[in-house]
Amino acid sequence: MDLSADHILVVFLLTTLAGLATGIGGFIAFFMKRTDTKALTFALGLSGGVMVYISLVELLGEAQHRLMEFEGHTAGSWIAIASFFGGIAVAALIDYLVPEDENPHEARGPEDIHGQASGEFSSSRIKRSGILFALAIGIHNFPEGIATFAAGLDSLTLGTSIALAVAVHNIPEGIAVAVPLYYGTGSRKKALFYSFLSGLAEPVGAAIAMFFLFHFLTPTVLAVLFASVAGIMVFISFDELLPMAERWGHHHISIMGIIAGMLLMAIVLI
């Protein structure tokens, strides 16, 4: 594990850039045609494919390999399994605690997002939904920031791969924040501000890992963290990204996006 100041700074910046990709999504939202749902369908599928592939192939595989090395074959396998499904349970609990109407991880179609501009809801309610989307996304992204930073300290290659997956996943989440806020306030600046703000949970998680969890990041703890975040990312993909892609009405385009996302990460991880 490289603990030099330069390496730590590089990893922290990498984590920050991954989180701020929500702002890219917020920016893209202003240029999307409401009737063109194919691009977002593909993007959602791509995000899901990226996250599922890196979670199951890289993070969980790496966690299981390390745990088996340090804890023994049987114990290591069980710890990896428990950590993975523990991550799923944590993500599901967070999802349960956020009200359905304001949860960005409840599948939404064009009638839910763009329909808000037609006057079905008051501007104050739309604005409130956008702010709550940003808050909920921040809560979900917090452990990803810890994992990206910890992985980057251990291996810059692994940290970069996780950061790329998180960044790709954050772009459609930024869209989910920016669209209702833009419709509710009429201000592009506010929509962009909150979409960027929701991504700050990533560097906050990295900062906490750096200042408070640093001395506890043993090889076993790192492996447990990798497996847990793999579970969180798989849950987000199956609960949010893939169902939302389906609801936009282009099944085969979403499948192509998933395959493209998996292929992208397979090439990146070579």
Curated annotation (Swiss-Prot):
Spans traversing the lipid bilayer: 8-28, 40-60, 78-98, 131-151, 162-182, 192-212, 216-236, 250-270
Residues annotated for Zn(2+) binding in this entry: 144, 169, 173
Binding locations of Fe(2+): 141, 144, 170, 173, 202
Alphabetical UniProt keywords: Cell membrane, Ion transport, Iron, Membrane, Metal-binding, Transmembrane, Transmembrane helix, Transport, Zinc, Zinc transport
One cellular-component annotation, GO: plasma membrane
Bilayer topology annotation: Multi-pass membrane protein
Domain of life: Bacteria
Cited Pfam families: Zip
Assigned protein family: Belongs to the ZIP transporter (TC 2.A.5) family. ZupT subfamily.
Listed PANTHER family: ZINC TRANSPORTER ZUPT, ZINC/IRON TRANSPORTER
NCBIfam families on file: PRK04201.1
Function: Mediates zinc uptake. May also transport other divalent cations.
Protein's name according to its UniProt entry: Zinc transporter ZupT
Organism field: Akkermansia muciniphila (strain ATCC BAA-835 / DSM 22959 / JCM 33894 / BCRC 81048 / CCUG 64013 / CIP 107961 / Muc)
